[in-house]
């Protein structure tokens, strides 16, 4: 999930959009590793613990692109769920929306903790990331339930880690055996 959210943020920034990626997997922050950030104490948990903190001072520029910024998770708090349930998260996302074209939130996996469902209230769109040949089929039932019950806004699914060499269709370019039926390759 951090791979997908990071690449989405980078792609949008390369299109000239001002993007911030927010590390909201505050129990197991991963953005510091992805973006090689040195200051692991600065982050959104500081703001959520004390909304008087200047949120924009916690946002760090990226060395990848001038349009890409990172708001890491920060120090792991003793009460992550409580912090995410507070109105401070709503206020933080509003501030970020006023300052950036896109706010991408990297969250904890669903099912492990309730954090992601709490964060869902401030998202305009939710992306459930599955890994090919790894995600259990039962989780797809959970995705359907989340969509039907509208627990996450505009729920989409991304499947990554697809080994195209193992797939029967869609790997090779061309018309294959179907081309002959339409006259392709005839002179």
Q: What do these predicted regions represent?
A:
Residues 1-187:
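P-loop NTP-binding module
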């Amino acid at each position: 999930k951090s791979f997908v959210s990071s690449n989405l943020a980078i792609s949008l920034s390369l299109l000239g959009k001002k993007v911030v990626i927010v590390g909201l997997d505050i129990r197991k922050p991963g953005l510091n590793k992805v973006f090689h950030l040195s200051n692991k104490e600065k982050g959104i948990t500081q703001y959520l613990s004390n909304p008087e903190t200047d949120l924009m001072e916690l946002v760090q520029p990226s060395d990848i692109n001038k349009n890409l910024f990172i708001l890491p998770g920060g120090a792991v708090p003793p009460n992550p769920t409580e912090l995410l349930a507070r109105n401070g998260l709503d206020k933080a996302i509003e501030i970020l929306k006023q300052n950036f074209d896109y706010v991408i939130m990297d969250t904890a996996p669903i099912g492990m903790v309730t954090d992601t469902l709490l964060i869902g209230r401030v998202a305009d769109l939710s992306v459930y990331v599955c890994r090919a040949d790894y995600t259990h089929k039962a989780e797809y039932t959970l995705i359907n339930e989340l969509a039907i019950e509208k627990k996450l806004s505009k729920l989409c699914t991304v499947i990554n880690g697809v080994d195209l060499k193992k797939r029967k269709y869609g790997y090779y370019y061309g018309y294959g055996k179907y081309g002959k039926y339409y006259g392709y390759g005839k002179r």
